[in-house]
Amino acid sequence: AAEVLIDPNTFSEDGTFSLGGTSISPDGKLIAYAVSDGGSDWRTWYVMDIASRELLPDVIEWSKFSGAVWAKDNSGFYYQRYDTPEEELLVDINEQPKLMFHTLGTNQIDDTIIYENPAQPRWGWSISISENNAYKILSISDGTEEKNRVYIQTTDSNEFLPVIDELIGEFKTTETRGRRVRVVTRL
């Protein structure tokens, strides 16, 4: 029989908290889920053991416009975060996001910066990991335009290299085979 894993109705008594995203670990044992307060774009991520329904101590704050993308070895996940707002939580302009990696069982303050670009404060990104774990692929956008850049990092490099470095269309990676990456475009 079907069971409810996460019930957003239990997040708050007044119903102002909502489910902002979910991501199940590759082994199917954990789920990262995001909670939003009052319709805000800000997300707080939590991690739950699916079998026991117990929350792990991992809490990720100041995430926005981001999913959680698990490492293939289930050790943690990637997410986009912003610096903690100084004053007006819902008014301050948020710039200079960082792509972070959170290792399960550690404090968010110890998360690793995977990518940032202070010269481009409006850029945002999403990451995908190739099935063979050979590539990390960044899709980089500027604002809400439906065009993106594509950067790739190989397992033998710490640097993301631009593959498509202009906003000339929409590019989505669909699969990898060996050293080849298939990209679908909409120009």
Describe each PLM feature range.
Residues D49-R53, T103-N107, T154-N158:
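Short loop/turn segments that connect beta-strands within beta-propeller blades
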Residues E13-A34, E61-Q80, A119-S139, E159-P162, ...:
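Conserved beta-propeller blade repeats
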Residues V4-E13, E54-V59, T112-E116, E159-I164:
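A short beta-strand motif characteristic of beta-propeller blades
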